[in-house]
Amino acid sequence: MKLTRRRISGNSVDQKITAAFYRDMSQGLLYYDSEDNDCTDKVIESMDFERSWRGRILKNGEDDKNPFYMFVKGLVGSNDKIVCEPIDVDSDPDNLDILINKNLTGFGRNLKAPDSNDTLENLIRKIQAGIPEEEVLPELKKIKEMIQKDIVNRKEQLLKSIKNNRIPFSLEGSKLVPSTKKMKWLFKLIDVPNKTFNEKMLEKYWEIYDYDKLKANITNRLDKTDKKARSISRAVSEELREYHKNLRTNYNRFVSGDRPAAGLDNGGSAKYNPDKEEFLLFLKEVEQYFKKYFPVKSKHSNKSKDKSLVDKYKNYCSYKVVKKEVNRSIINQLVAGLIQQGKLLYYFYYNDTWQEDFLNSYGLSYIQVEEAFKKSVMTSLSWGINRLTSFFIDDSNTVKFDDITTKKAKEAIESNYFNKLRTCSRMQDHFKEKLAFFYPVYVKDKKDRPDDDIENLIVLVKNAIESVSYLRNRTFHFKESSLLELLKELDDKNSGQNKIDYSVAAEFIKRDIENLYDVFREQIRSLGIAEYYKADMISDCFKTCGLEFALYSPKNSLMPAFKNVYKRGANLNKAYIRDKGPKETGDQGQNSYKALEEYRELTWYIEVKNNDQSYNAYKNLLQLIYYHAFLPEVRENEALITDFINRTKEWNRKETEERLNTKNNKKHKNFDENDDITVNTYRYESIPDYQGESLDDYLKVLQRKQMARAKEVNEKEEGNNNYIQFIRDVVVWAFGAYLENKLKNYKNELQPPLSKENIGLNDTLKELFPEEKVKSPFNIKCRFSISTFIDNKGKSTDNTSAEAVKTDGKEDEKDKKNIKRKDLLCFYLFLRLLDENEICKLQHQFIKYRCSLKERRFPGNRTKLEKETELLAELEELMELVRFTMPSIPEISAKAESGYDTMIKKYFKDFIEKKVFKNPKTSNLYYHSDSKTPVTRKYMALLMRSAPLHLYKDIFKGYYLITKKECLEYIKLSNIIKDYQNSLNELHEQLERIKLKSEKQNGKDSLYLDKKDFYKVKEYVENLEQVARYKHLQHKINFESLYRIFRIHVDIAARMVGYTQDWERDMHFLFKALVYNGVLEERRFEAIFNNNDDNNDGRIVKKIQNNLNNKNRELVSMLCWNKKLNKNEFGAIIWKRNPIAHLNHFTQTEQNSKSSLESLINSLRILLAYDRKRQNAVTKTINDLLLNDYHIRIKWEGRVDEGQIYFNIKEKEDIENEPIIHLKHLHKKDCYIYKNSYMFDKQKEWICNGIKEEVYDKSILKCIGNLFKFDYEDKNKSSANPKHT
């Protein structure tokens, strides 16, 4: 039963209460979020089963305009009277057929009571024909009685299901044993004395079942049945039901012999016969198979499945297929039980004691959160590994290793790269230039500062490799310690990891801390703030008002981003100016609007028009204040936000009232203003009131509700998730009030439009950021100082935060240094390999995990939660330090002495047509006027530092090719694109206010656009096409599209790595359970999983293969792949894990080729065959990733080979755009279009399908298709002379 959280009706019609599911080893139950008591009966009784029945009978069950709504409501509602009256058919009897087909489902039309010949459709027609009520009403009462009995039965079944949905184990003394009938039965499949799988038990079931008899019955029935999907399913279902009824009734006639002794130790005797209850469990598994492949209810199927059923029903009925699939399902459930037992042992059993308080939903939730947090680091590590690997790709485009984190790779790098680097100045220049993309390396940009010593830089990179290797091997591999515990091990003097000298890393993080002042100055400059505001103005704002800038303050995960706050505030401000600003003078300006005292907070949010730079400077100034002043101050004074929680609810209620009253005024001219409507239902009505608790506690409640609602929305339940919007609105008002309080006196001077006149940029910056930092008006707070990481002999080691930035950075080099906080230094080296976007995503995951620590329950071995919370906050601020001090691409490129100036010839020539460089106009897109210096392009630099361009040259040869024709088209569009964009924006504002017209046609409401609006939409679409084409060309020419493909590549690989970690974790739990049940020796388990040596780098696959004997291997192969495998066959499957886990797809070359990405996906599915749900999730995960993050829809085709299903992309055209829909208010999916409308076909396309913008052009989609299919072995075949689009 799938039920974790469910919203149900409360005391009022519109009130919704969240019920959550809980289970332990004795029972399952439901409880309200606000209570701890068992509320299962109460919750089930309040669930709306009547609504479900209305939905089964009516096509739109909750639309009270449906002509049959009241009729069906009377049949379904226990307290409703049956309505036995004809409906209005506009005097045309033929309309009845139309109304029945349009409004009743097939199930509803054919619904009839037991022992009755009248369907619901027949009874409706009798009522319409005027048949007396006394003749029709008894039949309707029978249907009503049948529905009421069904509702009662469904409630009883749901109650029983919930109660029985418990953890299927119990404690007998200190022994964790199966407790449910089904789990006891499944565990009998393990033959403990012989330490094998009990195949004879399943064979005996099939012998008793005698499937050939059922097959003959099904075949005879289908020979007489039409070959439609539902007919086939019903026929098979009826034959199966009759056959199983006979087996249950006559069971004793088929079985002879004594029943076996109960328990796991059954000995696997050939004479063993199952008792009836166990055989009934087997029958249930057979029924589940037929329910899946022969679904009787249409809701369990779709067009694709129906077609497959019609084409393959004979195969689905074959004994070989049925037996294989039923056995697999049974064994999968056994494995799931063993894994669950091993999981509970792993997490909650230590020192021979069970943590019994966690053998329940709290414990299972604890496990889920811990594993999800560790997995969140995997994607970031995948990026870091790729970037480190890019350091060591030599000029011949070959790499000498598969995985940089292995010992073999490190030795190869030392001998083949670092030794050459030490003596080759050209290599050193190139090495420094690449390293400057990641770390604050000194390259010849200052005369008074020497270059970094090459030996120090080599040590830096070695430290980075060690750090990433350490994190990878303890994250990609399943380890007992949490990520935080693994980091703290680095500071343990007894740990081998403590031997790593991080003194060079400490020097580089010291530079970042010292650079904060300069970086902040650069931010003020690059954001345009110093161009529009004089120094004394900025200084007064910050110094006089007491605004301090903190680098970072730990946030709650619900706190909205500034861009969302400002956008919402600007929209509200605009709406209030339009609707409530003074109109009698015709003055709609900002000044007159400021008189509206009630909404003064919104006046800080001014719409940025046409990308005006002075407006952007103002917005950027507010952004700095939001992140570095407002949010840090909220930590000290929560009232800055909490004062606006209840006020925002009240504001929303009043807005709803005013909107309804305005609507009524327009609709009813005689509406009396004294009769204003008072509403109790509004968007934020269900949001809990603030009652004085801490902001963290309030946001925790809100987050729980938000996550529960997000899940319901994902499951296609009705309604919106308003919790995110609510907290955003709260912050809009709160931040506006903060600005009003702090900067009210400077408002007129701060707000645009502004002029650059008489503002000297350099003078302003010098005044704001003098050489003597103590004279600066900015007090920049950072929790880290130099002494956080380095102890200098004889000096204080206090961690003074604010003073870190105020120091001049000088120290006595003779002082002896003692490096500390290696946990932070290790993570710093890794973080420096990430982009800003990746750091933000990772930081968000850390924030969510930190916030969860306060509300989750923890087992007895987690005793240092305060220290964990503090470490998480430190790591979050470390991420902010790295993100804040990350140099821009132009800044890095300007420092480069070599590398960047040759990047086009070295890295990108294969992606650009030669004709481009022969034409002066198109050549200028990549080179400056000297024809030698490349134009600095962000995505080319990012690709150069991160992507496997040596591989992409082969994968995308002929696919990603920038042509002279495309460049000329781009140049032409560049000259006029602003006109198109401005026109598009103006038309969008106009079209937002138009509405579709409606006309009655054949009794249907038909929609259309009038001619005037049609031409506006036509012009909008034409402009949109030009803007979209420009974006496609721009993204391709500046290589943003190739970088997007690289991101897709990394994200897919990271998801796949996550699945290999799932496999390793599950094997750990499975083997642990096998040890616990006495079928695997503990020494073998220890040899595989419990290597605690400091140089342990995994090798999990090799250890499994080498440490299992023949009997162990046969048992594991039966459990995981349902067949006995020899050593080579077994090894061939589990070795599929390594190229995925080690990201070998990125490092392959023609001489060292790997499988295609498509093949790796299928290999992963084979590896996960022990868990069908997880196996099927592989392609779904990739589909969801591409769809949700990249607007790409992918189609897979399944084929069967030797009993295994393989998925492939049949054609590269199976990669499609998921378009962006514009003017959504004109998009009506299921509707009729007025046939007399102007340009009918165009209107039908726009209204029914939406006004679409394709995110990618066809050439990029083909590149993505080839990313999946490319294989060096098929290189000549797959990439020779492709047709360029």
From Swiss-Prot:
Keyword Repeat: yes
Region described as HEPN-like fold 1: spans on this chain: 353-510
Other known facts: Part of a type VI-A uridine-preferring CRISPR-Cas system.
Cofactor: a divalent metal cation
Stretches for region Disordered: 794-813
Coiled coil: 969-1004
Name the record gives this protein: CRISPR-associated endoribonuclease Cas13a
Cofactor binding mode and count: Pre-crRNA processing is metal independent, while crRNA-guided target RNA cleavage is dependent on divalent metal.
Function: CRISPR (clustered regularly interspaced short palindromic repeat), is an adaptive immune system that provides protection against mobile genetic elements (viruses, transposable elements and conjugative plasmids). CRISPR clusters contain sequences complementary to antecedent mobile elements and target invading nucleic acids. Unlike many single-component effectors, this CRISPR-Cas system targets RNA. CRISPR clusters are usually transcribed from pre-CRISPR RNA (crRNA) and processed into crRNA but this protein does not have detectable pre-cRNA processing activity on any tested pre-crRNA.
Record-annotated membrane-spanning stretches: none
